[in-house]
Amino acid sequence: MDPGTVFAGYRIEEEAGRGGMGVVYRANQIALDRRVALKLLTPALASDPGFRARFQQESRLAANIDHPNVVDVYEAGEDDGRLYITMRWVEGSDLRQEIESHGRLDPVRAAEIIAQVADALDAAHAMGLVHRDVKPANILLGERRGREHAYLTDFGLTKRVESAGGLTQTGQWVGTLDYIAPEQIRGEKVDARSDVYALGGVLAHALTGHVPFERDSDVAKMWGHINDAPPAPSTVVPGLTPELDAVVLRAMAKDPA
């Protein structure tokens, strides 16, 4: 949509990003004169009754998470046949952009960011909500009280359209392959431990500048998640502490019990 377009009571300011689920715009909520992130989902998702029902349910749950490290969900609805969700606009970047622009993070900074995201996940898991797609792009980095502050986003989009074998009906795996838990690949039931696995992978990426299983194909990545132990971060970046190694290896253990 072009800047100035009004959609569902929101005036579009600019496109902020796009992905497989849809397009994110920076927008202004006209009634409250409030800047928001407006995510407009693809028509294919809007046309699927199963997804629509889950989207509404998950969005309501996400809106009830009251935690400083979770992006506030303001509204989820449908207008002119398009599903949308609006969230707090966070001024800043995201963890993916930070790693792509600057490489691996200072270990203290990486640990602080991941600890904040872990707190956000604890709050969600206490409500029975599993994120299922924890990745650097969903970790927004802003500022709060003069300090860097991490926000976990996309909670309203955590239940994907699944068919046999764990694939979505559009042919995409549930979750991002660089961080996805083995049980998600196998199409098995997921719970909070799947998010912990993914967060361990994100920590490894932040500490080393490399994803846990850098492989030439998606199939090889999936094989790694299912069968191989992730490399300890200190084997990639000498000097990282055994304590950080232990956190990553425990989070990404194949048996999460």
Positions of the model-derived regions?
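Activation segment of protein kinases
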Residues: 47-50, 142-189, 216
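Activation-segment/catalytic-loop signature of the eukaryotic protein kinase fold
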Residues: 76
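AlphaC helix of the eukaryotic protein kinase fold
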Residues: 42-64
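C-terminal lobe helix-coil module of Hanks-type protein kinase domains
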Residues: 28, 115, 121-122, 131, ...
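Hydrophobic/aromatic scaffold residues of ePK-like serine/threonine protein kinase catalytic domains
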Residues: 64, 113-114
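Protein kinase glycine-rich loop
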Residues: 13-19, 24
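Conserved N-lobe loop of protein kinases adjacent to the ATP-binding glycine-rich P-loop
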Residues: 28-35
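Conserved short submotifs of the Hanks-type protein kinase catalytic core
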Residues: 80-94, 98
